[in-house]
Curated annotation (Swiss-Prot):
This is Tethering factor for nuclear proteasome sts1. Disulfide bonds: none annotated. Its main location: cytoplasm. It comes from the Eukaryota. InterPro entries: Cut8/Sts1_fam, Cut8/Sts1_sf. GO terms for cellular component: cytoplasm; nuclear membrane. The gene is sts1. Residues 1-83 are annotated as: Disordered. Involved in ubiquitin-mediated protein degradation. Regulatory factor in the ubiquitin/proteasome pathway that controls the turnover of proteasome substrates. Targets proteasomes to the nucleus and facilitates the degradation of nuclear proteins. Keywords: Cytoplasm, Nucleus, Protein transport, Transport. Residues 20-34 have a biased composition (Polar residues).
Length: 312
């Protein structure tokens, strides 16, 4: 009976307080909050936070130093000022630049020699283009409906442009003649183009108006003679023999009405018997006859001639 001592009953709530809870860190409330059920509005806020946060540990977004840009500072005071010389020259066209250069050389003559030695030598193509521009201006000023021989009215209309072209021819031609021009091919090429321009000069009903045209033919003929003589001294005139200048000069002489006959005679004397048959007045019956020089080059010289047999 002693062993069966009745133990007083213990209330259940005493057992709950008697349990020892483990030590909890300061992050336990955060963990408990993360284990609770999430609401829909909480998910949206978390996505925004994650997207806005920059991944500092991601290797794809390595921060790079930006280059230092030196921004041009604006001027504190804006005021008008003239253009610099390089900018001013950029705005000038060819005619304006030529006028400025001529005015400066006239005021300071010592600069003229400097410009002449600094500027490049004019080429045949550029010079002939200048002459063609003068020729085009002359032709466009001729009244419409004019025939082959123009009237005095047309002459008064175009005489200023005619004089400009003749003066340009007279100035440019000596530049391409020896001894100023040492290459014979350059001189001949210029004379060929300049003679074509003279062929295009208008003809006038009044004879005195044709004096300028006749004088141009006379000057260009003397230039041909000078260049032919100089070419004959170099290499036995090989430039004249293989350049076809005998045919070209013969055609120019025919177009001019025989005004270049002196040049034709000089070329005939320079070439001798090798090119004589291609020149007018040297026994050639027509323009289709092949010259002796061409026959020698092609190997057909002497074909069709009787061969003499027996003692000479």
């Amino acid at each position: 009976m002693n062993s069966l001592v009745a133990t007083p009953p213990v209330p259940p709530h005493f057992y709950e307080h008697s349990r020892f809870s483990p030590s909890r860190s300061m992050s336990t409330p955060v963990q408990q909050n993360s284990n609770r059920k999430r609401k829909a509005e909480d998910d949206g806020n978390d996505v925004d936070v994650r997207m806005s946060a920059s991944p500092t540990n991601s290797p794809a977004f390595t921060p790079r130093p930006l280059p230092n840009r030196q921004m041009k500072r604006s001027r504190p005071n804006v005021s008008g000022r003239p253009l610099s010389l390089p900018r001013l020259l950029e705005t000038l066209d060819t005619e304006a630049l030529r006028s400025v250069l001529q005015a400066v050389c006239q005021r300071h003559p010592e600069l003229g020699d400097e410009v002449v030695h600094t500027a490049p030598r004019p080429s045949v193509a550029s010079t002939l283009q200048v002459l063609r521009n003068y020729q085009s201006t002359l032709q466009t000023s001729i009244p419409l409906g004019s025939g082959e021989y123009l009237s005095d009215y047309a002459y008064n209309r175009v005489k200023q442009h005619l004089f400009s072209l003749l003066e340009a021819l007279s100035d440019f031609t000596p530049h391409f003649l020896p001894p100023n021009e040492s290459q014979t091919s350059v001189s001949l090429t210029y004379l060929d183009g300049a003679t074509d321009i003279i062929h295009g000069l208008p003809k006038w009903q009044t004879p005195r108006h044709n004096i300028g045209r006749d004088s141009a033919y006379e000057e260009i003929g003397k230039a041909w003679v000078l260049v032919i003589r100089e070419a004959a001294k170099r290499g036995g005139g090989i430039q004249l023999q293989y350049g076809g200048w005998d045919q070209k000069l013969a055609k120019h002489n025919e177009t001019s009405g025989g005004k270049l006959q002196d040049a034709v005679n000089e070329l005939r004397n320079s070439l001798g018997w090798m090119g004589s048959s291609a020149l007018p007045g040297a026994g050639a019956s027509g323009g289709d006859q092949i010259s002796i020089r061409e026959q020698l080059l092609s190997g057909t010289y002497g074909m069709g001639m009787p061969l003499k047999v027996g003692p000479w």
